[in-house]
């Protein structure tokens, strides 16, 4: 039985504060494009899905996109600044949308967290001032919003009042969305100048530092953390997946993959499933308890901004060449893939009827896929997996080819090496008999 999130809404990055990346009743492949929503200008953030809309942040507005049609349902004006993923939390009977807005540039920039009541579509005062710009997304849990900035700060903000609960200072940039699980907040700060990456475990209530993890020799690259059931998982630039104890940060296991990880990508982690993807295009299913590799699929296309998600029993991932790919969770076979087209596929949100992802380019767009009952499923192994039947067939072909290339010319050469009067052996017999 696969672990599932408690709602069919995809309210934040990877669907839940711990980043499980799982929707048990999501649509199955094959897929067809249901609609495309193009930004009026600039890029778009990865979407969240709440009720009947997908919500995405644009350069100067936040858009609500109708899931049924792909048309614009509403928009909220935004001043500008870096585009980061929004989130939706629940306070009482209200759904509160939170996103980041920035006015001004450089030292004069004024970055704030904005709260909007989705029931009334009214902004809630006051805005919460932040110390720096926030390139990553927002996690919501227990009535609070958690986010980081590019100066290493992690914040907790009360969703109901906008009050800044606490600020924790780290070294480097918090590029990804913090993970929240069992009263702890996990944030990764990548410090390029010092060449180190640090995972901070913070008390969700006070922001006090509980422990830190800084793997030796890993450099300044660490993926977005995922956490559940006392386990925290990150990938590092030394090609290792690390599983840590949520209690004290001690390492439970590590597992080697083929390459390093994107600092804005996360794993999909639940009690019985762990899916990770590396930057150059490898997807791996690992055992959460031991780190043993169950299968891998080498897509050989960059995965700069997407994270694996699980829709039912299908693993979905977006690629740099514009494809969405679907891989069967149990077999590790590729069962469906979209067409290559310009613009990478970034972070993915899943609803019971649709898969929605952000697509890069200028302007950016959201693309939604639906189940296509007339489509065809594939059954393609990773190009790194050897098919025994094919291997035997290729070996047989190689033997025949070797015979043709080596033996036949040798026979021809041997015949040409005989005396010019070719039938000598037959002619010489009588002569030899005479000599005898």
Where are these regions (language model features)?
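A short beta-strand motif characteristic of beta-propeller blades
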Residues: 33-37, 71-76, 122-128, 163-168, ...
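Hydrophobic secretory-pathway targeting helix
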Residues: 1-3
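Short loop/turn segments immediately following beta-strands, especially the blade-tip
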Residues: 369-380
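Short loop/turn segments that connect beta-strands within beta-propeller blades
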Residues: 66-70, 117-121, 158-162, 203-206, ...
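Juxtamembrane cytosolic interface motif at the C-terminal end of transmembrane helices
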Residues: 406-416
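Cytoplasmic C-terminal tails of single-pass
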Residues: 416-436
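Blade/loop signatures of beta-propeller domains
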Residues: 5-34
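Repeat-blade elements of multi-bladed beta-propeller folds
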Residues: 7-17, 40-62, 80-114, 127-155, ...
């Amino acid at each position: 039985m696969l672990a599932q999130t408690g709602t069919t809404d995809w309210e934040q990055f990877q669907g839940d504060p711990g980043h499980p990346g799982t929707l048990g009743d999501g649509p199955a492949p094959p897929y067809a494009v249901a609609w495309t929503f193009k930004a009026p200008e600039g890029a778009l953030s990865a979407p969240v899905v709440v009720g009947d809309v997908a919500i995405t942040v644009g350069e100067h507005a936040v858009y609500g996109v109708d899931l049924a049609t792909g048309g614009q349902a509403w928009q909220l004006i935004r001043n500008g600044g870096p585009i980061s993923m929004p989130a939706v939390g629940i306070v009482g009977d209200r759904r509160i949308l939170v996103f980041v807005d920035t006015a001004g540039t450089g030292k004069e920039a004024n970055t704030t967290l904005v709260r909007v009541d989705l029931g009334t579509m009214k902004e809630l005062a006051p805005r919460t001032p932040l110390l720096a710009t926030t390139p990553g997304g927002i996690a919501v849990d227990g009535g609070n919003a958690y986010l980081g900035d590019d100066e290493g700060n992690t914040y907790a903000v009360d969703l109901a009042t906008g009050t800044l609960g606490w600020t924790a200072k780290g070294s480097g940039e918090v590029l990804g969305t913090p993970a929240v699980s069992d009263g702890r907040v996990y944030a990764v700060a990548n410090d390029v100048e010092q060449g180190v990456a640090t995972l901070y475990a913070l008390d969700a209530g006070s922001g006090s530092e509980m422990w830190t993890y800084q793997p030796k020799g890993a450099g300044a690259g660490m993926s977005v953390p995922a956490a559940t059931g006392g386990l925290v998982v990150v990938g590092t630039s030394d090609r290792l997946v690390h599983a840590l104890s949520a209690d004290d940060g001690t390492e439970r296991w590590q597992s080697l993959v083929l390459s390093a990880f994107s600092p804005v990508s996360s794993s999909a982690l639940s009690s019985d499933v762990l899916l990770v993807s590396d930057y150059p295009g490898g997807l791996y299913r690992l055992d959460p308890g031991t780190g043993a590799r169950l299968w891998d699929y080498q897509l050989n296309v960059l995965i700069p901004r997407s994270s694996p998600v699980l829709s039912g029993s299908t693993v979905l991932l977006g690629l740099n060449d514009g494809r969405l790919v679907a891989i069967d969770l149990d077999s590790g076979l590729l069962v469906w893939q979209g067409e290559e087209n310009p613009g990478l596929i970034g972070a993915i949100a899943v609803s019971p009827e649709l898969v929605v992802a952000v697509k890069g380019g200028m302007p950016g767009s959201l693309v939604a896929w639906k189940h296509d009952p007339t489509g065809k499923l594939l059954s393609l192994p990773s190009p790194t997996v050897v098919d025994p039947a094919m291997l035997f067939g290729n070996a047989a072909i190689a033997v025949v080819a070797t015979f043709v290339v080596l033996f036949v010319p040798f026979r021809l050469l041997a015949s040409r090496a005989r005396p010019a009067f070719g039938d000598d052996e037959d002619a010489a017999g009588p002569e030899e008999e005479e000599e005898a």
